[in-house]
Amino acid sequence: MRDLKTYLSVAPVLSTLWFGALAGLLIEINRFFPDALTLSL
């Protein structure tokens, strides 16, 4: 039970950091390669 409470308190922090880093990475890629995210076939 104690491990579950530790996990529940750590998981939102880790997921917030992970999604923040992922969003920042996508923004930087989109800044340098603005046409990479559009599907131009």
From Swiss-Prot:
It is found in: Plastid, Chloroplast thylakoid membrane. Its main location: plastid. SUPFAM superfamilies: Subunit IX of photosystem I reaction centre, PsaJ. One of its GO terms (biological process) is photosynthesis. It comes from the Eukaryota. GO terms for cellular component: chloroplast thylakoid membrane; photosystem I. The chain crosses the membrane at residues 7-27. It holds the Pfam family PSI_PsaJ. The keyword Plastid applies. It is a single-pass membrane protein. HAMAP family: PSI_PsaJ. May help in the organization of the PsaE and PsaF subunits. This is Photosystem I reaction center subunit IX. The gene is psaJ.
